[in-house]
């Protein structure tokens, strides 16, 4: 996409996930292999000479169950005469996609606690004031992004784009920046960049200041806007999040920074998960050892937020990561950004349900 937002270049090449050290790399590889090999994630290989049929059209889910862990809160909220809806914090999230042996995959991250993006979900988080600071941009300008995101405020548009790049770097180590148009940092896992990553996570220098000090700029052309998601009204913590999509820049690999004293767990806290596995049934998902119990699988709707499931449907329907990203680029400047909300859909079979709506 040029500076005026008129077009989007093809996505960059996609690479695999790895950890920062030899031991962790082995753990990450073993964990990834375990996830791929789990029966819930496995799809039979095609015979030699067999041509797979075109991807089947997958309709977006008509309804999504409220996670069991949130049902009581949802019922209590619905029973109130005067329902108070807490304000939603502005946020940004990034769906990182690639093509895998079982079809297109999403990079998912495990987080402790009840984040609005799910225990397992897309990299992302709240906007900060530092995200609004000016910095060098390569690709669509803040004005072009404001048009695409349907925002009259250039500062807010810049804040969302910077937050997406920052959160992606903090949570996965992937960095969408470069020295010039078409350039990208090849190895952001160096000690210098790890120091910058730590500073961002501790709310030290913001990303714009970090880039200015290093003579770098944001590669905003590597992001694709997908939609805007607003948390259900009953939730205590709510996000109004702009969701972007991206591929892994050439020469980079995703990493997760371990919590202090828990370095051995870091390798299993993120994984590439086939989109089809997320929507077809119980699935093995990243997390600390034993977090899914003896079965090692879970229904994705119990631990992920609705936008992750909706994106999984769109990605599976596209048939490939490249087709998905190109589909977001085609005519992007002329389409209003869809806004996803979750409306109550009643109770059925002992479960509360939500219905995705778009406006």
PLM ranges: what are they?
Residues 2-359:
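N-terminal leader/linker segments that precede catalytic domains of diphosphate-processing enzymes
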């Amino acid at each position: 996409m040029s500076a005026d937002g008129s077009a989007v270049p093809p996505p960059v090449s996609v690479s695999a996930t790895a950890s920062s050290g030899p031991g962790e790399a082995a753990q990450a590889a073993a964990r990834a292999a375990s996830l791929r090999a789990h029966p819930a994630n496995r799809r039979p290989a095609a015979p030699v000479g067999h041509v797979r049929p075109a991807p089947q059209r997958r309709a977006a889910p008509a309804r999504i169950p409220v996670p069991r862990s949130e049902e009581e809160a949802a019922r209590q909220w619905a029973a109130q005469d005067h329902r108070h809806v807490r304000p939603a914090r502005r946020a940004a999230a990034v769906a990182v996609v690639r093509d895998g042996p079982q079809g297109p995959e999403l990079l998912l991250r495990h987080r402790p606690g009840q984040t609005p993006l799910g225990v397992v979900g897309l990299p992302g988080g709240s906007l900060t004031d530092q995200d609004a600071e000016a910095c060098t941009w390569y690709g669509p300008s803040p004005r072009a992004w404001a048009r695409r995101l349907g925002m009259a405020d250039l500062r807010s548009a810049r804040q969302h784009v910077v937050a997406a790049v920052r959160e992606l770097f903090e949570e996965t180590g992937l960095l969408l920046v470069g020295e010039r148009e078409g350039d990208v940092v090849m190895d952001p896992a160096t000690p210098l960049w790890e120091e910058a990553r730590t500073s961002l996570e501790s709310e030290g220098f913001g990303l714009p200041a970090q880039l200015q000090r290093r003579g770098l700029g944001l590669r905003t052309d590597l992001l694709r806007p997908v939609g805007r998601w607003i948390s259900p009204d009953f939730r205590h913590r709510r996000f109004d999040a702009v969701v972007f999509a991206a591929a892994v820049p050439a020469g980079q690999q995703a990493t997760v920074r371990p919590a202090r004293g828990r370095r051995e767990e870091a390798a299993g806290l993120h994984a590439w998960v086939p989109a089809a596995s997320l929507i077809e049934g119980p699935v093995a998902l990243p997390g600390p050892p034993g977090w899914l119990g003896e079965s090692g699988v879970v229904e994705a709707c119990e631990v992920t937020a609705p936008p992750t499931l909706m994106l999984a449907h769109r990605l599976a329907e596209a048939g490939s990561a490249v087709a998905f990203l190109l589909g977001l680029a085609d005519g992007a400047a002329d389409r209003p950004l869809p806004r996803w909300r979750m409306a109550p859909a009643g109770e059925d079979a002992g479960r509360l349900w939500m219905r995705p709506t778009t406006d």
